[in-house]
Amino acid sequence: MLEKFVDSLWKFCRKSKFQYMTPVADAVDSFCFEPLHTPSSPPFVRDAVDVKRWMMLVVIALMPTVFVAIWNSGLQALVYQSSDPQIMEAFLHISGFTSYFSFVSKEIGIASVLFAGCKIFLPLLFISYAVGGTCEVLFAIIRKHKIAEGLLVTGMLYPLILPPTIPYWMAALGIAFGVVIGKELFGGTGMNILNPALTGRAFLFFTFPAKMSGDVWVGSNPSKIKESLAMMNSLAERSNFDGFSQSTCLQILNSTPPSVKRVHIDAIASNILKLEHVPSQEVLQSQFSTWAESFPGLTVDQLSLDQLQNFVTSPTAEGGLGLLPAHFDAAYSLTDAIYGIGKFSTGNLFFGNIVGSLGETSTVACLLGAGLLLLTGIASWRTMLSFGLSSLFFAWLFKIISILAAGQSGAWAPAKFFIPVYRHLFIGGLAFGLVFMATDPVTSPATKLAKWFYGAFIGFLTILIRLINPAYPEGVMLAILLGNVFAPSFDRIALKQYRQRRV
């Protein structure tokens, strides 16, 4: 039956009046069956894995992130829009898989979570394929060439890097820009120098920044989520710094001013977690001893919230830590991110029980996809490894430099440099970009040595933007796009090295 439909489509397109539709018939035939065409120029390689199957393997590798996107976006939306502080409290204090699924089944419902997630993700996926496919077809008809299979992957990647609240017309505009400007302008699939999905996201980020950052990470209606959070905070009598919010770890890291130092974070952590020792313990205890002269019997781990705020914001000459009162909220939030408190626990970050772009929240889902891509040889392990190691190294290097520059074990160094190095792999889109974006064989270098340079360059830029640039909370997107631009240069350097070795 399918074969008859394809045959009838070919007959229809072979009529003189509709010959311009031949690329459409060829695309449908290639999608349903084995491609009809063979290479017209060398190299000629006989292999069962053609471009279509290669693309489908990438789509299969993306399935774990797609499932997490549906599940997590649905769960976060239902919890955040519940207006019930008890549900939110229970959700934030989940520990372990047993309590997690017990909470979902009792408080929310598995079917409800999946239905809510599908309502958020599937329309964006449909828009991505429909609009992107239309652009591909139009260019194929105009240029009279075959429709390539590249959109199979681009159409899946694009919605996974969007916030769930993105308006549909913006999503359509972004994928159109990515396909037309990022790919077709350079000649189509295999000719583009920029990743089309990231190009579309970059266009939206710089054109509509308010819709791509801020409070855009939960549900599909930001206004409803804000009202629900305000009601929950009111009912739970929570203040600004300990209230429920949809801030991501990267947002907190980026928005924290340099005036928030390591000693401020350690003081707050000592009080919340009842820690007996923190990295800046010597400075902290010295200041506290002076401040506590007016409050005999107090210890830093037994302060009330008001006393803690008073200690942290009092002038250093009086034994306080000298933080501006207006920055106490930021310091309190950053403490959660650095010490893994509440929703920013290592387990939540690794498995994806956090808010963020649809497909970028779960590191474990990205690693499952990486396993398939590496097993099939589609992705370069050199790019992945150099990207990951470079990110870890430069995050560690910034930390060491800040300690050496500030002295006193880094007690007075900016606190944002002290987020645990490994956490950079779990937050934002680093894991997703490392696995699925940086390894794009079209926009990444072709030589082995160049792949090492390329991955290291992207890792360095990612951490540099995250920790130094105050304008952008996430550096992965810009780092990979810049890496795409410099990829030919890395290949040129690598080839030059090869020639020198042979001589």
Curated annotation (Swiss-Prot):
Question: What sections of the protein cross the membrane?
Answer: 55-75, 85-105, 120-142, 161-181, 186-206, 361-381, 387-407, 417-437, 452-472, 475-495
List, in alphabetical order, the GO biological process terms annotated in this UniProt record.
Answer: respiratory electron transport chain; sodium ion transport; transmembrane transport
Q: Which UniProt keywords apply?
A: Cell inner membrane, Cell membrane, Flavoprotein, FMN, Ion transport, Membrane, NAD, Phosphoprotein, Sodium, Sodium transport, Translocase, Transmembrane, Transmembrane helix, Transport, Ubiquinone
Pfam families in the cross-refs: NQR2_RnfD_RnfE
Residues with FMN phosphoryl threonine modification: 248
A GO molecular-function descriptor: FMN binding
Query: What EC numbers are recorded for this enzyme?
Result: 7.2.1.1
Looking at its record, which EC class is this enzyme? Answer: translocase
Chief place where the protein resides: membrane
Instruction: Provide the cofactor list for this protein.
Output: FMN
In its keyword annotation, does this UniProt entry include Zinc-finger? no
Q: Which reactions is this enzyme annotated as catalysing? A: a ubiquinone + n Na(+)(in) + NADH + H(+) = a ubiquinol + n Na(+)(out) + NAD(+)
Q: Can you say where in the cell this protein is located?
A: Cell inner membrane
Q: Domain of life here?
A: Bacteria
Q: Can you state the subunit structure given in the record?
A: Composed of six subunits; NqrA, NqrB, NqrC, NqrD, NqrE and NqrF.
Q: Which PANTHER family does this entry report, sorted A to Z? A: ELECTRON TRANSPORT COMPLEX PROTEIN RNFD, NA(+)-TRANSLOCATING NADH-QUINONE REDUCTASE SUBUNIT B
Biological role: NQR complex catalyzes the reduction of ubiquinone-1 to ubiquinol by two successive reactions, coupled with the transport of Na(+) ions from the cytoplasm to the periplasm. NqrA to NqrE are probably involved in the second step, the conversion of ubisemiquinone to ubiquinol.
Q: Which HAMAP family match?
A: NqrB (MF_00426)
Protein family: Belongs to the NqrB/RnfD family.
- Name of protein: Na(+)-translocating NADH-quinone reductase subunit B
What organism is listed for this UniProt entry? Chlamydia muridarum (strain MoPn / Nigg)
What are the top taxonomic ranks of the organism? Bacteria, Pseudomonadati, Chlamydiota, Chlamydiia, Chlamydiales
